[in-house]
């Protein structure tokens, strides 16, 4: 297996798809990386030679990927929570952040329903 950015990418996949196994690289960024490094996107990972892998490593090191990216995202959320803005409070309360309604729906974000006893009439 080829190892790029600390991740073993699958040998049987096309390089274009295999790069998307790295956190922070989607299909569009993978295509840009391959274009910049001059590697054929249709070739399988097992058919890459060491020179191609070195080129891919050099280009991917220009991006923030994997653990660094996860840490950066976590720090951004923590900053929002620390300054006490609306977005930070919504994150802290596990509610939708971008203005969606919560009276109904928002089940994914709020979790399973909590049963409340009915009122006697």
Swiss-Prot record:
Q: Which UniProt keywords apply?
A: Ribonucleoprotein, Ribosomal protein, RNA-binding, rRNA-binding, tRNA-binding
InterPro entries, per this entry? Rbsml_uS13_C, Ribosomal_uS13, Ribosomal_uS13-like_H2TH, Ribosomal_uS13_bac-type, Ribosomal_uS13_CS
Q: What does this protein do?
A: Located at the top of the head of the 30S subunit, it contacts several helices of the 16S rRNA. In the 70S ribosome it contacts the 23S rRNA (bridge B1a) and protein L5 of the 50S subunit (bridge B1b), connecting the 2 subunits; these bridges are implicated in subunit movement. Contacts the tRNAs in the A and P-sites.
Output the superkingdom of the source species.
Bacteria
**Subunit field text:** Part of the 30S ribosomal subunit. Forms a loose heterodimer with protein S19. Forms two bridges to the 50S subunit in the 70S ribosome.
Q: What's one Pfam family the UniProt record gives for this protein? A: Ribosomal_S13
- Asked whether the UniProt record includes Heme among its keywords, one would answer no
Family membership noted in the UniProt record: Belongs to the universal ribosomal protein uS13 family.
Protein's name according to its UniProt entry: Small ribosomal subunit protein uS13
Amino acid composition bias (Basic residues), ranges on this chain: 100-121
Recorded hits in PANTHER family, A to Z, give: 30S RIBOSOMAL PROTEIN S13/40S RIBOSOMAL PROTEIN S18 (PTHR10871), SMALL RIBOSOMAL SUBUNIT PROTEIN US13M (PTHR10871:SF1)
Annotated Gene3D superfamilies: 1.10.8.50, 30s ribosomal protein s13, domain 2
Q: Where is this region: Disordered?
A: 97-121
- Does Repeat count among this protein's keywords? no
Taxonomic source organism: Prochlorococcus marinus (strain NATL1A)
Write out the GO MF terms.
Answer: rRNA binding; structural constituent of ribosome; tRNA binding
Q: Which GO terms describe its biological process?
A: translation
């Amino acid at each position: 297996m080829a190892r790029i950015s600390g991740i073993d990418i699958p040998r049987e996949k096309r390089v274009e798809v295999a790069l998307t196994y790295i956190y922070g690289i989607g299909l569009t960024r993978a295509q840009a990386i391959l274009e910049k490094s001059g590697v054929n996107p249709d070739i399988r990972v097992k058919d890459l030679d060491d020179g191609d892998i070195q080129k891919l490593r050099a280009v991917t090191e220009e991006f923030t990927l994997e653990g660094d990216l996860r840490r950066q995202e976590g720090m951004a959320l923590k900053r929002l929570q620390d300054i006490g803005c609306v977005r930070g409070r919504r994150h802290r309360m596990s509610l939708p952040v971008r203005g969606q309604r919560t009276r109904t729906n928002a089940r994914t974000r709020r979790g399973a329903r909590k049963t409340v006893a009915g009122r006697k009439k």
